[in-house]
Swiss-Prot record:
UniProt keyword ATP-binding, yes or no: yes
Positions that bind ATP: G9, M10, S11, G12, G13, V14, D15, S16, M35, G128
Record GO terms (molecular function): ATP binding; tRNA binding; tRNA-uridine 2-sulfurtransferase activity
GO annotation, biological process: tRNA wobble position uridine thiolation
Protein's name in the database: tRNA-specific 2-thiouridylase MnmA
Provenance organism: Clostridium perfringens (strain 13 / Type A)
Substrates-to-products reaction catalysed: S-sulfanyl-L-cysteinyl-[protein] + uridine(34) in tRNA + AH2 + ATP = 2-thiouridine(34) in tRNA + L-cysteinyl-[protein] + A + AMP + diphosphate + H(+)
Region of interest: Interaction with tRNA: 150-152, 306-307
Function recorded in the entry: Catalyzes the 2-thiolation of uridine at the wobble position (U34) of tRNA, leading to the formation of s(2)U34.
Similarity field: Belongs to the MnmA/TRMU family.
PANTHER family tied to this protein: MITOCHONDRIAL TRNA-SPECIFIC 2-THIOURIDYLASE 1 (PTHR11933:SF5), TRNA 5-METHYLAMINOMETHYL-2-THIOURIDYLATE -METHYLTRANSFERASE (PTHR11933)
Keywords: ATP-binding, Cytoplasm, Disulfide bond, Nucleotide-binding, RNA-binding, Transferase, tRNA processing, tRNA-binding
Encoding gene per record: mnmA
Any single Pfam family the record assigns to this protein: tRNA_Me_trans_M
Length: 359
């Protein structure tokens, strides 16, 4: 019987390394690949834990040698710049706060990498994500990881049925501590490697500076205003701010104020008291459903408005033009345009979309 072939994306970290080991132990014919995404026109600064960096390639190659699996580096530079970096920069210029990891998953890891895998006759792609995939009731379902603290389903809500059918995520059945334990047991040097947490293409995590360098003619100073339009001070460019931000505003008003809105048309940043950043209703676009084919009517769910948020009770309702209205039971802090909102029903990912506006 021919072994099923799987191409696994290896970042050089402990999760994808152990995922490769687990798949080999399960009898798959495993091929390791690292996506080459760093941009040669920029000075590339190394950072410990950086995903897909130059040192990450070396770590991934050493793991592949240890596991005795083939290993390749694939050039994804152009696609990464077009689908992730340019998108990231454009969204901030439009006054929104994007999630580049979700774009990377959607366009690179589970689209282009899957196409390349199919091109060499592979049956699956695999990653080290903490999530589970199961077929239930005739649909492939995305299910929360065993390790709730490390669950990564929020960043995977865009996966289609075809992508889920051809994707393996073995780490979803384990806790992070157990994954590190397995890595140590089998002698992988990356067993204690630090997790990558920041944006991989911005080494110092200063996104404002990065965007200014990438699009210097698009960022200009403007006014801080209150909700009535009264000028309160000067800002250095809307790309430096996000909803709910308090620190780094440089305003001395004798009272704490928070960013409540960003207007790219007038190039203004609206600030106000903390109660102004609590809202209950939003509209989202670019919807992808997983557990259901489409939303026929109102559905009670739990929803997350950002990666680090706790799921909160909400009702989702279909709107015209493919939009979905999300109404939370309790007010949510700093709902931010450009971020994703993801819907859950128990352990299943119902779907999600991009936050377009607040009501």
């Amino acid at each position: 019987m021919t072994k099923k072939k799987v191409v696994i994306g290896m970042s050089g970290g402990v999760d994808s390394s152990v995922a490769a080991y687990l798949l080999k132990e399960q009898g798959y014919d495993v091929i390791g690949v690292t996506m080459q995404i760093w941009q040669e026109d920029k000075e590339y600064e190394e950072r410990e834990g950086g995903c897909c960096s130059l040192s990450a390639v070396d770590d991934a190659r050493r793991v592949a040698q240890k596991l005795d699996i083939p290993f390749y580096v694939l050039n994804f530079r152009d696609s990464f710049k077009r689908n992730v970096i340019d998108y990231f920069v454009d969204e901030y210029i439009q006054g929104r706060t994007p999630n580049p990891c979700i774009a990377c998953n959607k366009y690179l890891k589970f689209d282009e990498l899957l196409q390349k895998a199919k091109g060499i006759g592979a049956d699956y792609v695999a990653t080290g994500h903490y999530a589970k995939i199961e077929e239930r009731d005739g649909r492939f379902q995305l299910i929360r990881s065993k390790d709730d603290r490390k669950d990564q389903t929020y960043a995977l809500y865009n996966l289609t049925q075809e992508q889920l059918e051809h994707t393996l995520m073995p780490c979803g059945e384990f806790t992070k501590d157990k994954i590190r334990e397995i890595a140590k047991e089998i002698g992988l040097d990356v067993h204690n490697k630090k997790d990558s947490e920041e944006i991989c293409f911005i080494p110092d995590n200063n996104h404002g500076r990065y965007i200014c360098e990438a699009a210097p003619n698009k960022v200009r100073p403007g006014n801080f205003v209150d909700k009535y339009g009264n000028v309160l001070g000067k800002h250095k460019g809307i790309v430096y701010y996000t909803i709910g931000q308090r620190k780094g505003l440089g305003l001395a008003l004798g009272r704490p104020v928070f960013v409540t809105d960003i207007n790219p048309v007038t190039n203004t940043v609206v600030v106000g008291p903390e109660e102004d950043i609590f809202k209950t209703d939003l509209v989202c676009k670019d919807i992808n459903f997983i557990s259901i084919d489409k939303l026929e009517g109102p559905m009670e769910v739990e929803a997350k408005i950002r990666y680090s948020a706790r799921p909160a009770k909400a009702t989702i309702s279909p709107m015209e033009n493919g939009r979905v209205k999300v109404s939370f039971e309790d007010k949510q802090r700093a709902i931010t345009k450009g971020q994703s909102v993801v819907f859950y029903k128990d352990d299943l990912v119902v779907g999600g979309g991009i936050i377009e506006s607040l009501l």
